[in-house]
Every structure is written in C-alpha cells, then in structure tokens.
Amino acid sequence: MILPTSEDRRIIWLQRWLALVALALIGTTWRLWTASTEFPRIPWFSWLCEIPNWCDRVALAGLISGLVSVLVLAPWRERFAAPKVRLAIFAILAVSGGMLLLLDQHRLQPWAYQFAWIVLVLATAPAGRALMLIRLLTIGIYLWSAISKFDATFLATTGPDLLHGLWQTLALDPHLLDGNRASTLAWGLPLGELAVALLLAMPWTRRFGLLVSIVMHGLLLVVLGPWGLDHQPGVLLWNLYFIGQNILLFGARIEPVAGSERRWGLAEMGISLALLLPILEPFGWFDHWPAWAVYAPGAERVTLLLDAAAAERLPESMQAHLGSPQWRDGGRVVRTDLWSLRALSAPIYPQGRFRAAVASAIIERYQFDEGATLVVESRADRLTGDRERRVFRGADAIKRHATSYWVNTRQ
C-alpha cells in the first residue's frame, strides 16, 4: 500500500476513513441513535428530558449528512479546503453530534468519544498539527486502556475469557490455560497495550509499534469476531478503524507543509483534556469509557432483581431479558446488559449511575412499588478485587439511590 507523503493528502485520507467507519458504526447501532426502542434514553442533564424523540432523528440526519459530505468532498481539496465549506461541514458535525451525545449518556460509546475529539482537531488545527495531536490521542488511548487492565478483576475474569476465546479460535492446546496459567498469561494483554503505546511514542520504534498494533487489533478481530466470541459488529469495526488509522498516522514518513506549526489552540486544549481527565477515573470523578477503561470489569456493578410476581408482570418483550431464577421464590435478574445488546446492538454504558437510571426507569414504567431490589456493588479493589455491597429494596429506596448522583438519572 502506497501512502501519500504530504500532510495535506494524509489528513484527507484520514478524514475519509473516519467518515466511512463512523457511518458504518452508526449503521450497525442505528437504534441507539434514533430513540426508537423501549430502552430508556437518559440525557446528561434533566432539562433535556422533555426534548421529544424526533429531535434525535433530526440530529442524526444532520450528522449523517456531515459525514457523507466529508466522504464525498474531501478528495476535492480545493473545495473542501475552502473556509466556508469546512466551517459549514464541521459546524454540522459538532452541533448534530453534540446534541445526540447530550440526549443520551448511552451514546458515549468509546468510538463516539474518540471520534468527537478527532473531529475537533480536524476542524481547528492545520494538517501537520492535526496529525501530531491525533497521534498523541491514540498513544494515550493505548496507555490508559493498559493501565485500566492492571487490575485483579480483569486478570481473574475478562483477561482469561479473552485468552480462552483466542485459544479456541486458533485451535491451540487448551491445557496451556489450565489452573492459574490463564490468569498469569492475561498479564500479557495490558502489557501488550502498554508496549504499543511506548513503541508508538518514540520515533525510532514507531514502525515496529505500528506492526505490533496491527497484529494486536488483528488478533482482537479473530477473538471477538463471529468465529470467536461473536461480539457485536461495532466492536469489530472499531478495531478495524484502528488498523487503518494507525497505518495513516504512523506509516510512511510524512513531508511537513510550510506553516503547519502553530502555538497553543483549541485542538491542543481538547487533546490535553482527553489525555489528562482519565487520571480522575479511579476516584469516581470521571466515567470509565471516556477514561479508556475498555474491557475493564472493575467498574461499579448495579443489578436489578425482581421477585416472581413482579417478573411475571413484565411484558413478553422484557421477559426475554430475564436471567434464570436465582431466589427460592423464583426471583429473576433483569439483564439490562443483554437488553442493550439485543435492542440497540451496543454494549450498555458501564457507569453505575446509568445502570441505576435504567433500573429506575423500568420500575417507573411498570409501576413496581414492591418486589424490586437493587444491588449496588462498589468498584473492585484494584489489588484484591473485593467489593462493598449495598442493597435497596422497594421502588422508593431505588429511586432515592438513583437520584443521589450528580449527573441526571431521569429518562
């Protein structure tokens, strides 16, 4: 593959690649963006709860039109580089995309958050500076993702699960993962991400880092694909995006354009925030996904339990999302994670606040005054995996807990 060597041409390829993958991701998760299912829509601010669902569709139409414009116009540099044209396109992307994200916390999927920062950079920085900033963002994603997985819970659960999926897909000897070997080998997953971050950060190892990153994402495609753990298409598309993006960012040498350097600006401020805010995540002051804690199972757990009578009152569409009876009286767990995957083709937002909001919305919708219990487990201790548990019984106690968060939990 022959890559363009000029900054302007490389950034055009990156813009088109981002627009293409973003359209594909929106297409595979379209129900998430249209507010067209029973799954609760939880805005970030309570004053947004009254906005009708048709506004989501108008904003989505604007976002799609902006992405299509980038895809179609980017090859015509003279037209796309015209200040008025670029301003109009990126204004449409910013307004429509921002509205969609504000109207539902669930939409802050990791790829959507990443793309939002990249669009800010593309809109406000010259080509050379934009490439440098997006490189920094990419390195930061690998770094923070690795740090989030140096965790007892990951090494005991998700890490071994991924390894078992890889072993099964590649038909490797399963006995190699017997006993504690899987947990020991799971250390290689965050260490691999950390190695990619360090290799990409240093110019003299960047090409090797690119190769390692491609192998890593390729293996994830194998493990998470339909021939492995069969995860949602969005997960596969995001990994595919990283392969293409990294080739464009860290591939063949790029010839700088005169005048592409500049001082501190809006793009630099945005990427600095994206790289620094994850520091707050372990203290509970920043959400898991924006901190790039992906596939990190140590987040707060929130589980809604219904007794047998309450479970029977659910409509048939909700019965499919109930877990097996776990109580002596036949009580059931409401699997909101499965509900999200089946209804929206997207993983549920992992924050305890959001899961409590979804539980509260279910109780309010089906008027469960009694028969509902919410079990809230704290984030896992990084060294031991231990959690503290709180139990809220009845609709009033559950709603009080849901409204105790700083961020909105109303639908």
Segments (PLM) and residue ranges:
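Alpha-helical membrane-anchoring segments
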Residues: M1-Q411
